[in-house]
Amino acid sequence: RMGALLAMRRLERPEIAQFLHDEDSLLVTEAARAINDVPIQAATRDLANLTDDKNLSEPAWRRVVNANFRLGREEYAQQLGAIAVNESIEANIRVEALQALADWGSPSGRDRVTGIWSPLAGYRSIEDARRAVQSAMPQLADHRFQNLTSALIDAVQAVKLETASAWLLGTLRNDELSDSTRSDALEALAQLAESALVNEAVQFALEKGSKKLQREALRWQAQSADSLQAIKFALEGEDIQGQQAAIASLARDTTQEAMDLTGKLMTQLVSEELSGALSLDVIELVEER
């Protein structure tokens, strides 16, 4: 049977899809490789629809995910969502399904598995991916697996799923997650949510977050007297990254007090009283003014 499969691969025969249902997992994997890697486009739908087989190898699963991504229609976005929530599938494959949904609206010209240049043709609706992510949210929202949570944040942000704002805030508040994951949640929230919710998230991060979260919060802090006070506090600290974030935040503040603070930083730069690590940040700040 392997000989027949390899012959079909060489001839690029769509009948190779029959091996996707073989009892020998090695043959199933080789058929999936042939359909995706050659590629044998006439059999791509057969590969994409292999989502009910729980015994697939990781290489086969990666190609199933890729087939659904490449076909690019609503039903295939939904199948990626189904893979993402299927707990019988390895977490890294579920993450890959979410990443595919995140990339749905702006696919790379290279194949996700082989890296070969193979640009996708035809219209792809980001709304299809948005609906798939929204359908998957209830089963992925419990933060049990941090890599899935991170991938879900990326997908939510990419498809602009505004209804996930409350979940993003809850993710930010979850101190069992890594700073990186919580920081990503804050960034996504800042780009999706209404200002009141963003302000609540920023205030939480500034008051109770780690230095990394505080730096991220400074980036999204709304213009106010309190925000300028937070910027000054960060500039007086010893955390270089925090100071850089404060300078970047200062660029968005158009008040006279912010202008005065910019002038003070420039004076420190000229008189060499400013840390060399901040010189470029201050120069860029002045140029933006």
What label would you give each PLM region?
Residues A136-Q139:
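Amphipathic alpha-helices of TPR/Sel1-like and other helical repeat/solenoid scaffolds
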Residues R1-R13, Q18-F19, V28-I40, N49, ...:
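Structural detector for internal amphipathic alpha-helices that build alpha-solenoid repeat scaffolds
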Residues R110:
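Short acidic/His/Gly/Ser-rich catalytic and metal-binding motifs that mark active-site loops
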Residues R13, T44, A77, A129-Q134, ...:
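Core helices of alpha-solenoid repeat scaffolds
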